[in-house]
Amino acid sequence: MNPNFKAAGGNVEDLGEKVTELMGQGRAREDLAQLVLGTEKEASEIMPKATEGPIEGQPPAGMLKRYAHNPVLESVKNHPCESRYVLNGGAIKLEGKVYLVYRAVGEDNVSRLGLAVSDDGFRFKQRLDHPIFAPEEKAEAQGCEDPRLTRIGERIYMTYTAYDGMIAQVALASIPVDAFLHRRWNAWQRHGTVFPGITNKDAALFPEQFNEKFAMLHRVDPHMWVTFSPHLSCPWPRKMHKILAGATSGMMWDATKIGGGSQPIKSRFGWLLITHGVDYAHIYRLGVMLVDLENPAKLLYRSPNFILEPEDEWELGKDERSWVPRVVYTCGAVPRDGEKSILDADDEVIVYYGAADSVICAATACVGDLIPERLRWERRGYTWS
């Protein structure tokens, strides 16, 4: 054990508690790594310097356009598992249909996961009256929350937040594509918590490997991280982490924390990330980032502006039916047309978001609207002047 850790009053038995405490205080980079590891080199491999805010001089992103008939999904009073709220749906497109796996809350205030299906991405005419995934393990006793779906080969991997009433952790489960399509929910396989004992949320897997390693976005407050692993089993390694983006300074829209949103979407210009940020008034807004196609730890673009903020009645949550007012928060997005593996500037995406943590809404934008023209020009190898 590092002598600096002992000098600080720590011992081996208390190490896990110390790790959780320092990360929860947002002191992970400068305090925890060198305290435990003792050398700057080793520390930088695990917790390198954060990107403090938007890259200087970058142009603003275009705004998302709300679907005219929001919300696309509401609670159902006679469904016990979702009689109070539905929110934060992970989305995946299979065989031409959009499958929305969403967080459902009933009278017991425990989060379970429901399923709705749409032919056009907006009208969800098929909907189950029972959950497809519910708490079973101790770590998720009080809820399985905020699912995000990624297809890797012939399996669908789902990251979600496991909540035991005290700590929220990133958990991972998977199911064969065929079993999902045929609704064989007993085929779900739980892989466990990804970073056991650490308060962590907003996780999403990339659908491809990078140098034979899988990659996952997640958030240890207040930063957005990317982590690599040679395997998909849990737990993931303690090394191969990088802080991708940090909360901004001052009174910006993402000043207190920033985190992931939808699963990564592959575009010709990079991996498109719909993110979220929170300000000092505790208002949740959406933003956008772009990371390199071959190295998702390389941030290419971070929107200086938000692309959606709470404005309408569903998002502001002014009535007694709303759970948390002034929130827009996404867990999923899909291409509007077709199932293209890589999107171009004129391809449109549908972003699903929880509004006031109470209903699910949809918004759209073309990739070219979210990624500014200058950046798209430069990514094609041209010089912008």
Region roles according to the model:
Residues 329-330:
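Canonical pleckstrin homology
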Residues 2-84, 88-142, 151-204, 208-256, ...:
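Beta-rich carbohydrate-recognition and catalytic domains
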